[in-house]
From Swiss-Prot:
Positions of UDP-N-acetyl-alpha-D-glucosamine binding: T11, G12, G13, N124, R164, S195, Q291
Native source species: Leptospira borgpetersenii serovar Hardjo-bovis (strain JB197)
Record bears the keyword Cell cycle: yes
Gene symbol of the encoding locus: murG
Catalytic activity of the protein: di-trans,octa-cis-undecaprenyl diphospho-N-acetyl-alpha-D-muramoyl-L-alanyl-D-glutamyl-meso-2,6-diaminopimeloyl-D-alanyl-D-alanine + UDP-N-acetyl-alpha-D-glucosamine = di-trans,octa-cis-undecaprenyl diphospho-[N-acetyl-alpha-D-glucosaminyl-(1->4)]-N-acetyl-alpha-D-muramoyl-L-alanyl-D-glutamyl-meso-2,6-diaminopimeloyl-D-alanyl-D-alanine + UDP + H(+)
Keyword Transferase (UniProt): yes
Biological function: Cell wall formation. Catalyzes the transfer of a GlcNAc subunit on undecaprenyl-pyrophosphoryl-MurNAc-pentapeptide (lipid intermediate I) to form undecaprenyl-pyrophosphoryl-MurNAc-(pentapeptide)GlcNAc (lipid intermediate II).
Descriptive protein name: UDP-N-acetylglucosamine--N-acetylmuramyl-(pentapeptide) pyrophosphoryl-undecaprenol N-acetylglucosamine transferase
Pfam families per UniProt: Glyco_tran_28_C, Glyco_transf_28
Amino acid sequence: MRSIVIAAGGTGGHISPGVALAEVLTDLKEKIGYENLYLYSLIRNQNNPDLEQAPCPVLWHNLPPLSSNIFLFPFRYTIQILKTFLLFKKLNVDVVIGMGGYSTVSSILYGILFKKKIYLCEQNTVPGNVSRLFFRFANKAAFSFPPKNSAIPCDYQVLGNPLRKKTLPKMSLKFSEKYDTKKKTQFNVLVMGGSQGARQINNIVIALMGHEEINIQFRFRVLTGSALYEEVSKKTKKDAELISYSDNMKEHYEWANFVIARAGSGVLSECAAFALPMILIPYPYAKDDHQMANARYLELNGAAIVIDQKDEDESHLFKVLDQIANNVNLLNDMSISSLQCSHVDASKDTVKYFFSLD
């Protein structure tokens, strides 16, 4: 019985699209000639909500990162790779789908050594180290955004970032369909820093809440990140709407008129699916500055305004919000552009591309 493995470790940005592909493959695996489907992730992700709700069995491994103990690393790394090889041979794994990150290395090496099909998903415009290393061995690769360097040494297509079924909108409402310009009510602003939260963004928005003119025009809902919730709640007013973590992002996207966020691929793809204008403050220390590259792509296409800063000075964001408050048409144009950048069928399209389905 042949099997498919989706290697999705690392952070939520790798896990969520992996689970999204699993949702589609669960329904199609027999049609494409495979009996079993598994997700393969790091043990530390056992409490990840997406993996807890996975539509297929999840297998666990403990591949160490390169930064672990330099003396024990070679031994631990080799042992874990061998364990992966033995497990995959036992399961008769014939296809490996890598979602990016160091945790996929053992799975991809299995595919190379035993000449199995290898498909890679790259979420960012600037591919990560693992993707760059293994593109040449891949049968196909799927990108969420157009790669900054188009010289990719394998067949690839830009298909969007796979999204979970529970996150997809029933209808993508543009800004003009959600905000009544005649009433001129407060703008609903969703603030989020990604799966881990972002202290910088939290502190910038807290400072903004100290400006009365901002509070009159904007209503903030801040997803602080679980680890930062207590810290933020101590700094803000009692009536501030703070949420530590949400497993139902759809309701927040439907509530929002626009978002203030980092520029991870998952967040950007979800916001685009909901036709949301974006104010992006990319994480300044991201590997290869990939968040800035993602953000600039959306800015170039009219869906986002990018703020490039490392400090917590709220004046930059204040100016942008003031610009928005006095130009509602800008938000409407950004909303239309955001929807044009979306790929709501990315999960299905990626599976069809990998397995050559009509």
